[in-house]
Each structure stands twice: as structure tokens, then as C-alpha cells.
A protein has these predicted regions:
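Active-site-proximal cofactor/substrate-binding loop regions of enzyme domains
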Residues: 1-16
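C-terminal catalytic domain of Rieske-type non-heme iron oxygenases
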Residues: 23-171
Length: 171
């Protein structure tokens, strides 16, 4: 039996596995930088210390890329799940139109949505961090009291899991 070994890191209740080109036989002799810096929440405008979270695992009978696609689609969120999201300011009846700004760089793709009648007021920000993390902020990350972290995991052919964490800051 040959078992491959890969560098791992535990952060905030997650175990990250760095699948390098070649497995290592001596895990004490790995000199690579941490491969998960773009997954760190504090690198994305969010501090753990002021928030509490709840976690849910959700299994789907479809390819994980389809779930990512749904989570990135702002209209899907509010038109399909509009009545289940407890928010009077952001729902399908209020958001008849909006402005959108898209930021693309090598680490992430981010969509920022602004109210049409108040183009300086951000109501939601969705950040996709490849290969499978999505951050959904309620408003600007610097002042947001709510963050949803979605980690998409392929489990097999038309099988996927999403680890959903809801972070909330209380007054």
C-alpha cells in the first residue's frame, strides 16, 4: 500500500489540503508558502473575533459547478429564495433594478450591487474565490454585520456538498 502525503493546514475549523504536483514523503521538509492565503476571511475584509457563526452541510444531486453558478447569480438568490431570506431591505419586491460593478483579478471575481435609486449604497457583494469558495456580504465588507461563506466540494458524478457558514455580528 502506498499512501501519498500532502501539506495540510487547519484554519478556523477547516482543513485545507495542498495537492502539489508531487506528493511528499517527509512533511517536515516542505518549504512552500501557505497555499490558502486567498481563502483567509481576514484577507477578504472580515475578522472572526467579532462574529459568531452557525454551520450547515447541504448535499446536492448535481455537478458542483452548477451550484457555484446558482450562488453567483444574484437573481437566482432573490427570485427563487426571496421569501426565505429574512431581509426587508433586500428582496425581489424592493430590487426591481440595481447597478452592478465587477472586479476581476487573479485571486477572485467580485460583483458589487448598488441600489438603483441610491448608487452609493451597496446592498450585497458576492466574491468568488476559485476553485470553490463564495463569500456573500450583506453590504460593504467594512461595515457588514452578516457574511455567508459557501464552500463547494465535488463528491462524485452529479454529487456535491456545500459547507454553509453564516457569520453574524451582534450589536
Amino acid at each position: 500500500i502506498h499512501l501519498s502525503q500532502y501539506k495540510t493546514s487547519e484554519k478556523n475549523g477547516y482543513i485545507f489540503v495542498h495537492f502539489s504536483k508531487k506528493s511528499e514523503t517527509d512533511l517536515n521538509n516542505i518549504s512552500e508558502d501557505t497555499p490558502i492565503s486567498n481563502y483567509e476571511l481576514y484577507e477578504n475584509g472580515f475578522s472572526h473575533k467579532d462574529y459568531v457563526f452557525e454551520e450547515v452541510l447541504v448535499d446536492f444531486k448535481c455537478d458542483w459547478s452548477r451550484i457555484i453558478e446558482n450562488h453567483l447569480d444574484i437573481l437566482h438568490i432573490f427570485w427563487v429564495h426571496g421569501d426565505t431570506i429574512p431581509d426587508k431591505d433586500v428582496n425581489k419586491n424592493v430590487l426591481v433594478s440595481f447597478n452592478q460593478k465587477i472586479n476581476i483579478n487573479p485571486s477572485y471575481i467580485e460583483s458589487i450591487y448598488y441600489y438603483k435609486n441610491d448608487p452609493t449604497k451597496e446592498f450585497i457583494r458576492i466574491k468568488y474565490i476559485p476553485p470553490g469558495r463564495i463569500l456573500i456580504y450583506k453590504g460593504d465588507p467594512s461595515s457588514s454585520r452578516y457574511l455567508q461563506v459557501l464552500d463547494h466540494i465535488p463528491l462524485g458524478n452529479n454529487k456535491a456538498r456545500v459547507i454553509v457558514r453564516h457569520y453574524r455580528k451582534f450589536l
